[in-house]
Structure formats: structure tokens, C-alpha cells
Amino acid sequence: MYEKDRLYAAFQKLRIDEKLSYSLGEKAAVNPDGITCLKSTDRSAIYKLLVKKKSGTIPLILKVYKSSREKNAVEINIYSKARSVLGGLLPEIYLIEESNHETWIFMEFVSQIRGQLTFHPKHFKYIIPSVAELHSRTFENKKISDGKWRSWLPVYESETMRKGRKKQIKKTAELLDRALKDERTKDIVKPHYRQISHLLEQKGPDFFPELIQNGSAITHGDLHMQNICTHDASGHEPWDIQFIDWESAKYAPVWFDMTVLVEILIGFRKDWSRHAEDIRTFCVKVYAKEMKKRGFHFETPPMTLYKMAYVQRTLEKGLHTQLRRIFDNRGGELLPYHADKVSQWGRELGL
């Protein structure tokens, strides 16, 4: 993380004011007192800047990527190379600057939905059209999965990713064995252990070929509320959405995004549990309808695909994440939900 003074000195050295003025189409200057660090990790840091223009002061976001690690490279490339395809679904990018083995991206500040309102299931209908729009832009586009983007965009069907899933599932099986002996987890895991461990050992890493058969596109990969932004969440029609934090983006079956957006939130929101079936049915219908509007139809029933995507993602990633969090004393409250749903839907889907 940069101290405010050091960061501002770097702006002066790199002539950032001049470059932003060119991008914004009018004279602009970063206010040295208006620099706030919002978040800093070993991979990146995010700063909010106040930029003075003739027409008034505007907030901007600066994201500093500290290395070219794979996840950073994916997000940097989404912001730099995918703008022509994903325009309108990303924040406006004003400047990309390379500095001392770091990449600095100056972008539009758009407020996260979380914090603008108390989220209610009805609000999904204002977000899902943008998810469908995102997927429709590159749906089954082989120029994306086989073309020049393949050098930086992970492809779910690739041998590299398949090997990664195999490795991850093996780790999940090991954690499940450990969970059966751990006082914190054994009562949660025991009723489902035989079924889930059998699936992990015998059936993976790809449990449902239908997911790939029903279409892939650029997916965000981490559609939680803090990664979904809009300037105005007060309207009663589809919101103008911009997605941020693209480090998990890949060319993958589209239904994974829907299960993260909807089912993971249902798992967290205990107050929604009585209406869970109605909520997911409503969301799946909205998504299928929005994709149909854009000319795309799913051969397999949409609700089946939704459940398949959830089970696949949970077996390859979700269970591992929750078990790891429990063993690291960092939570893991979704473990009972995941174990129960994987068992129930796994049987229902014939696994």
C-alpha cells in the first residue's frame, strides 16, 4: 500500500493529471488530500481519488496490481482488451499505466449495490438482465475460446483447467476425510459423507456434460453483491449494471454465474429459507427469458442446468472453501447448506 504523499508524488512524476485530462476531455487534477485507500491485499490495492475538473469534482478508482500473477493478468486483460466486447458492463476505463512492475488502472467510480439498499429477492429482476447481456455478448463464440484471447483467458473445457479441477476435487476429498474426525464438522458431514466421497472419487471432475453442451461464454466467476455496481439502484426497471473484480473470469458454462448470484445468497440469507424454491424458480425463469430475448435457447430445462451448475461448482470448489475456512478458524457457515443441497440435488439429478 502506498502512503498518500508517495502515491501523489508518483502521479506527478508520471504526469497523471495530464493523461487524465486527455482521457476526460477537459483539464483535470487529482486532489492530493482526496486520496483514500479502500482495500489492500498482497495482490492489489484500491484507492478512491477525488479529481478536480472545470465542471466539478468527480471520484475515480485507482486499482494498483502489484504483480502479473495469473488472476491479476486476467482482470487487467478484461479491462484492457475486452472493453470492445464488454463495453457498458464494465466501469469506464480512463487510463492504464505501467509503473515499476505494477499496472495502474484508473476507472470510473460506480457504487456497489450492497450499501445502496436492503437487498430483497425482487431486486434480482433488476440485475439478471445484465447477467444475460454479459453472457450473450460471447455466447458460444469460438473466436474467444480458441482465438487470441486464449493466451490469457482461462477456458473451462481446456485440459489445463480440467487438471486443475481434478486436483481440487482430490483436495476436497482429503478435507472431507479430515472433517469426519473433527469435532466442529463431523456431525454436519457424517449424514452425507458416503454419498459425497463416492461422487468425488468415482464421478469427477466433470459431473454434468450438459453444462458445456448448453453453452459457454465469458463468465464473471464471482457474482457477489460487492462486485455488482450501479449509479442508481432506486428504479423499478433493470438497472444499468457495471461488474467489477474480474479476476475469476473465464470462458465457461454460463449457469455458474447464476448459482453464485442466487443460490449462494439464498444459503447466507436464513430469512429467505421459507421462500427459497420460489426465489430460485423466479430467477431461473427471468434469466432463461432474457437469454431467449437475445436469441439463445437452452436444450436442457433451465432449472436442471441451474442445479447441475450448483452441484458441480460446490463439489469442485464450494465444499473445499467452506471446510478450509472452518479449519483456518475463518467461518465456513455455508458448509451445512452445501452438504445438504449437494446430497439432495445430486440424487435428484441421478448422480
List the model feature ranges, each with a label.
Residues 1-32:
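Juxta-kinase regulatory segment immediately upstream of eukaryotic protein kinase catalytic domains
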Residues 36-52, 56, 200-254:
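Active-site acidic catalytic loop and adjacent metal/ATP-binding pocket
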Residues 47-73:
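ATP-binding glycine-rich loop module of kinase domains
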Residues 50, 91-97:
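Conserved beta-strand elements flanking the ATP-binding pocket of the protein kinase catalytic core
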Residues 63-93, 122-127:
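A conserved alpha-helical element in kinase catalytic cores
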Residues 77, 248, 255-295, 311-333:
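Active-site activation/catalytic loop segments of kinase-like enzymes and analogous catalytic loops
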Residues 95-127:
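Conserved structural core of kinase catalytic domains
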Residues 113-125, 142-220, 231-232:
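ATP-dependent phospho-/nucleotidyl transfer catalytic cores
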